[in-house]
């Protein structure tokens, strides 16, 4: 295959093109960003949250978005990353801090960490299909605790940004749909939920 050959998508209507996705993101941020003095980005270091962080920083650096009074990036340190990835995450937080972004590292308390459950309590290891106890415990709960602190300190005027990508697999899409539809939450580009 030569470089000029373009592979057509098997699902042409299932995805937004880059320019469409960027325009929708920019429109959403212009609509909701100015209403919030604090923006919080939940960052795991994975593809989705890193894409979100990169896009928001790009839009701000290009002057396409007005910056908030405060921007906070909360990194979920699971203590399970490979050392080079953990080092890179901390290096990026340091760079963000140098640019005026508040970088915070959140992690589960010792008694809720992966190996304490696996080795200390004998809980079976998680799998991707049916038994995913660790994601909530070592990522979601610590992030939620920190975000509640931020919201309380900001008087509730916080825009929470999370990277969610659908279309990776049917199992993942089902998980996203299930988690986003409980408690009145909404997920996906262009959706906004105002907490009271």
Name each model-derived stretch.
Residues 1-196:
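ATP-dependent adenylation/nucleotidyltransferase module used to activate substrates
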């Amino acid at each position: 295959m030569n470089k000029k050959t373009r592979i057509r998508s098997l699902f042409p209507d299932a995805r937004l093109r880059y320019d469409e996705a960027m325009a929708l993101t920019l429109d959403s941020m212009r609509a909701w960003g100015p209403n919030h003095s604090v923006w919080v980005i939940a960052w795991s270091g994975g593809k989705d949250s890193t894409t979100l962080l990169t896009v928001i920083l790009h839009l701000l650096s290009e002057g396409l978005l007005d910056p908030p009074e405060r921007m906070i990036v909360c990194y979920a340190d699971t203590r399970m990353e490979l050392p080079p990835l953990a080092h890179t995450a901390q290096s990026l937080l340091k760079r963000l801090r140098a640019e005026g972004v508040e970088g915070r590292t959140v992690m589960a308390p010792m008694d809720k960490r992966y190996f304490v459950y696996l080795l200390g309590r004998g809980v079976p290891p998680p799998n991707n299909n049916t038994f995913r106890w660790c994601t909530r415990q070592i990522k979601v709960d610590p992030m939620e605790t920190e975000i509640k602190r931020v919201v309380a300190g900001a008087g509730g005027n916080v825009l929470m940004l999370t990277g969610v990508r659908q279309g990776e697999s049917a199992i993942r899409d089902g998980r996203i749909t299930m988690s986003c539809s409980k408690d009145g939450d909404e997920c996906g580009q262009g959706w906004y939920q105002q907490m009271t």
